[in-house]
């Protein structure tokens, strides 16, 4: 009952924020870009929660057991990726005054490239958001609501409905402020869970440092194994490109940046936001080491799945009942902050890129937007329930793989537009964008079978390179399309 009351109180605060921030809004410009009035420091803080999903909240501490602290190599790459986004992509988006960032592809390459970029974003975001929300709903069902005999589908529908309620009228500026609250709750939950873990271990500060340093899982850098997915250069450069495509080429993440007052504030937001990932992910990994140490001290058998380590400690009371409340708040905050912005960004992409509502009257555009927002919410709930019906871990993995593969063509198309002075044949763009991920999948399967080499995130770079090469092959020298 305490968990249910916590969730209801949390949602009530979200509704209050939505009501306050949406009081003077309602226009399409406000919904899509917040009338360019969002304070950069609020956007920066809130974007942390939007990037850290519920999956991250439970997965990063657990991944320590399987790959030590080598994830920090990727996190370091993230920071340099954010610098690329701040100094190459953000100036472009502000110069063109874009609502949807894929409008650049239409201006630079052609209408089919524009539609293709938007389609790949929608596919990736819908599948990725459904998979993330599924795992969060599953955790809530297993550890919180199962005793109340609440069916999974009701949790899924309820979660999406809650997000729809406070986003369907309240615009991107509401998302900016609700994400700020949710980021605060997420970070507070993480810090308090670490605190209770340290209490159980009965450690002072020097003891904490010593426990982490002496752990067999404290390794961060891997320079000596080129085959391993944890090799430094694979992880570091993959981190750079992951940020470029999953932040810089993602409507969800860029929409908040475009709601800032000007380019300079958006860049400051990106600097602070990018740097904050380093200490935050380090804390998640340290929590993982401390939980493993606590399991050894208490002689507990850890679950087979790494993702179940933190939920086990929280749900079974090993850290006290307060941690279960904190864990629930952290999961809900991470899930909502990721899903609300994704739903708003998908609505923007469908309305602006596919339905071209910017040419409609204000009232017509608003009606279309409301219908699209509701339809996408229903579709999201359907996909979450579909994954539950299939109930197959390999299906969830496949969804993540498909979602990640769809960013490669976006990388290739934007790279072609930014770094070449050629015009490609626009009608071939959809085919090239489809073939590139398929070739990557076959290459991953064949090379793994023949040589044992394991592709990691570098598949993203290969995918983008293939798309880039395909566009080059279908292009000719000449003047580029005129870009404002």
Go through the PLM ranges and name each one.
Residues 1-484:
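Membrane-embedded helix-loop-helix hairpins and adjacent transmembrane boundary segments
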């Amino acid at each position: 009952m305490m968990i249910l009351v916590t969730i209801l109180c949390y949602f009530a605060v979200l509704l209050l924020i939505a009501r306050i921030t949406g009081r003077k809004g309602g226009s399409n410009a406000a919904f899509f870009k917040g009338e360019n009035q969002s304070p950069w420091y609020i956007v920066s803080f809130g974007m942390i929660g939007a990037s850290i999903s519920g999956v991250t909240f439970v997965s990063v501490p657990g991944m320590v057991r399987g790959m030590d602290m080598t994830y920090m190599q990727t996190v370091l790459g993230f920071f340099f990726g954010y610098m690329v986004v701040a100094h190459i992509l953000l100036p472009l988006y502000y110069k063109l005054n874009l609502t949807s960032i894929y409008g650049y592809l239409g201006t630079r390459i052609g209408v089919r490239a524009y539609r293709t970029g938007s389609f790949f974003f929608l596919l990736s975001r819908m599948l990725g958001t459904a998979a993330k929300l599924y795992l969060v709903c599953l955790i809530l069902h297993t550890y919180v609501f199962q005793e109340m005999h609440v069916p999974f589908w009701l949790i899924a529908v309820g979660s999406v409905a809650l997000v729809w309620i406070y986003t369907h009228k309240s615009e991107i500026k509401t998302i900016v402020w609700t994400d700020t609250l949710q980021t605060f709750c997420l970070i507070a939950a993480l810090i308090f869970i670490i605190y209770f873990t340290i209490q159980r271990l009965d450690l002072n500060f020097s003891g904490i440092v010593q426990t982490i340093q002496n752990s067999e899982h404290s390794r961060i850098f891997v320079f000596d194994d080129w085959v391993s997915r944890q090799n430094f250069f694979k992880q570091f450069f993959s981190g750079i490109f992951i940020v470029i495509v999953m932040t810089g080429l993602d409507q969800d993440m860029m929409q908040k940046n475009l709601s800032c007052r000007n380019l300079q504030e958006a860049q400051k937001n990106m600097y602070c936001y990018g740097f904050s990932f380093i200490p935050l992910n380090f804390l998640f990994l340290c929590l993982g080491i401390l939980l493993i140490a606590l399991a050894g001290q208490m002689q507990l058998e850890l679950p087979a799945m790494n993702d179940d380590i933190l939920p086990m400690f929280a749900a079974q009371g090993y850290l006290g009942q307060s941690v279960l409340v904190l864990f629930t708040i952290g999961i809900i905050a991470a899930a909502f902050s990721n899903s609300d912005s994704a739903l708003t960004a998908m609505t923007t992409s469908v309305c602006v890129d596919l339905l071209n509502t910017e040419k409609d009257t204000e009232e017509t555009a608003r009606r279309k937007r409301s219908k699209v927002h509701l339809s996408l919410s229903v579709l999201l709930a359907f996909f979450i329930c579909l994954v539950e019906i299939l109930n197959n871990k390999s299906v969830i993995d496949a969804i993540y793989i498909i979602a990640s593969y769809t960013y490669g063509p976006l990388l290739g198309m934007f790279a072609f537009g930014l770094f070449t002075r050629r015009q490609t044949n626009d009608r071939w763009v959809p085919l090239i964008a489809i073939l590139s991920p398929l070739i990557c999948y076959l290459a991953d399967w064949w090379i793994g079978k023949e040589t044992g080499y394991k592709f990691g995130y570098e598949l993203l770079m290969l995918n983008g390179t293939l798309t880039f090469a395909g566009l080059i092959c279908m292009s000719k020298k000449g003047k580029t399309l005129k870009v404002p």
